[in-house]
Amino acid sequence: MAETESCSASGVQPTRESLLSRFGAVAGRRISGRAGVYRVETVIEKPTPTEAEQRLMVPGIRAGYYLCFFGTHVFTPTLMDLLARMLESDPHRTVTLSAALAELARQEQYLALEDTGRRYDLGARYGLLTAQLALALNGRDRNEVLTHLLELLAEREMTTGEGEPHGR
């Protein structure tokens, strides 16, 4: 979609209000005739529930849910230019992707596409491991991965924390 529309695009997923503190979120208008596609108008990093209710409501999205980033993005060179300008204007300022995306949405078409996949929080404890296991278990080498996991679990059961077999 980003290529055919010649614009930046991000995957989003309707996310319940209680999880807003984990994700950046967007608001925009649904594009007529294109299910799950929105023209982004607002971007806020980890909004509070009050801020989300005031600025991120999207018609057609269930009450108490907001369009949060899924972690997939395709950017035009404009985004890199914006980030560079933000850094140049104040080298001591913290520059965030969300701030640059908010500016991008003001300058050019920026789309959000609903993604129905499962989101994994790589910043959470064991998040990266969980994501890697999910990918491996859904891949073509699933049986080999399961075999290795079972061997690892069996080996662990056969030894104590000191590496000694049980019962000694």
Please annotate each region the language model reported.
Residues 135:
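C-terminal segments
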